[in-house]
């Protein structure tokens, strides 16, 4: 594993891991924090919290590397991705593979400090991270796999805290899948024309002219499931206000994507960071109050 770590190469690795674009890490972080706060409840151990926060960053970076590796033959034909490190030649295929291995090993070393159940679940997390980028070649539902990959930290968090996977865990996991399909469809709407030309599949293409309607239905599903989690765990009204604020953000996103303009769809996608934040704040304040 020989690398020439020049400043330009380090910058290329930085871009390949998307450390300059934290939105993906944040969309992975919020459900992880939801799970830790519900599982504890409201008082996660500092070390477990640190392991999951660091693990989120490492696995998101690894996911970006394997995603670009899988798409390296396609990205050169898409306006938004033509200058990414792999299609531009700033990073070689071997360097990308090596970087992926290093990131995954670091994440696994962190997981090894947790219990056996969490370690076993981490194997599935790796499988999902590896499989997702290739799904867009074979199915119009890669966003479902993305939702499972981004949400797998939820059962891992419950396992790390209690070595159990209660109903709230799976409801939250399902809510995260619905949310991920909604926001990644918004993201896919940005590249829809290019994806059709080069044969990449997505829910944005599958949903067609019903895209905004289906996104809205998915968003309602997220709100219903998150409200049910609140009821099951006896959370206070502050949490339900947070769910309503998240709903208002979804309405705003619907307004943005109504005309299906690229910049507006991307703005709607980015707005989901606030959805995750608001729901976490609702959980944190509810547990703090009690």
Swiss-Prot record:
Membrane-topology descriptor: Multi-pass membrane protein
Alphabetical GO biological process terms: ubiquinone biosynthetic process
Transmembrane segments: 23-43, 46-66, 99-119, 141-161, 163-183, 212-232, 233-253, 268-288
Gene Ontology annotations for the cellular component aspect, listed alphabetically: plasma membrane
Cellular localisation: Cell inner membrane
Gene3D superfamilies: UbiA prenyltransferase
Reactions mediated catalytically: all-trans-octaprenyl diphosphate + 4-hydroxybenzoate = 4-hydroxy-3-(all-trans-octaprenyl)benzoate + diphosphate
Gene Ontology MF annotations: 4-hydroxybenzoate polyprenyltransferase activity
One Pfam family it belongs to: UbiA
Pathway(s) the chain acts in: Cofactor biosynthesis; ubiquinone biosynthesis
InterPro entries given in the database record: HB_polyprenyltransferase-like (IPR006370), Prenyltransferase (IPR039653), UbiA_prenyltransferase (IPR000537), UbiA_prenylTrfase_CS (IPR030470), UbiA_sf (IPR044878)
EC number in record: 2.5.1.39
Names of the cofactor(s): Mg(2+)
First-level EC class: transferase
Keyword vocabulary terms for this entry: Cell inner membrane, Cell membrane, Magnesium, Membrane, Transferase, Transmembrane, Transmembrane helix, Ubiquinone biosynthesis
Principal subcellular localization: membrane
Miscellaneous note of the record: A mutant in which deletion of the last 50 residues is combined with the 'Tyr-56' mutation in rsmG is highly resistant to streptomycin and has a small colony phenotype (which grow slowly and are resistant to aminoglycoside anitbiotics).
Function: Catalyzes the prenylation of para-hydroxybenzoate (PHB) with an all-trans polyprenyl group. Mediates the second step in the final reaction sequence of ubiquinone-8 (UQ-8) biosynthesis, which is the condensation of the polyisoprenoid side chain with PHB, generating the first membrane-bound Q intermediate 3-octaprenyl-4-hydroxybenzoate.
Family listed: Belongs to the UbiA prenyltransferase family.
UniProt name for this protein: 4-hydroxybenzoate octaprenyltransferase
Source organism phylogeny: Bacteria, Pseudomonadati, Pseudomonadota, Gammaproteobacteria, Enterobacterales
Gene: ubiA
């Amino acid at each position: 594993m020989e690398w020439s770590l020049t400043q330009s190469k380090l910058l290329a690795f930085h871009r390949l891991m998307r450390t300059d674009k934290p939105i993906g890490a944040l969309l992975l972080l919020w459900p992880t924090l939801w799970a830790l706060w519900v599982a504890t409840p409201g008082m996660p151990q500092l070390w477990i919290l640190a392991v999951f926060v660091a693990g989120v960053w490492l696995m998101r970076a690894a996911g970006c590397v394997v995603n670009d590796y899988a798409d390296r033959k396609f990205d050169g034909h898409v306006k938004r991705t033509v200058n990414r490190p792999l299609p531009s030649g700033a990073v070689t295929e071997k360097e990308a593979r090596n970087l992926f291995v290093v990131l995954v090993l670091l994440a696994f070393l962190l997981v090894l400090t947790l219990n056996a159940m969490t370690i076993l679940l981490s194997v599935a997390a790796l499988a999902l991270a590896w499989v997702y980028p290739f799904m867009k070649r074979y199915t119009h539902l890669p966003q479902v796999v993305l939702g499972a990959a981004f949400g797998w930290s939820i059962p891992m968090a419950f396992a790390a805290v209690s070595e159990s996977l209660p109903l709230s865990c799976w409801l939250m996991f399902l809510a995260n899948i619905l949310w991920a399909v909604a926001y990644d469809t918004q993201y896919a709407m940005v590249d829809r024309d290019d994806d059709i030309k080069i044969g990449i599949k997505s829910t944005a293409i599958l949903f067609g002219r019903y895209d905004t309607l289906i996104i809205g239905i998915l968003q309602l599903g997220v709100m219903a499931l998150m409200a049910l989690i609140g009821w099951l765990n006896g959370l206070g009204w502050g949490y339900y206000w947070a769910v309503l604020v998240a709903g208002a953000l979804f309405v705003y996103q619907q307004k943005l994507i109504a005309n299906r303009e690229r910049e507006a769809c991307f703005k709607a996608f980015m707005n989901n960071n606030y959805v995750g934040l608001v729901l976490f704040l609702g959980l944190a304040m509810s547990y703090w109050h009690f």
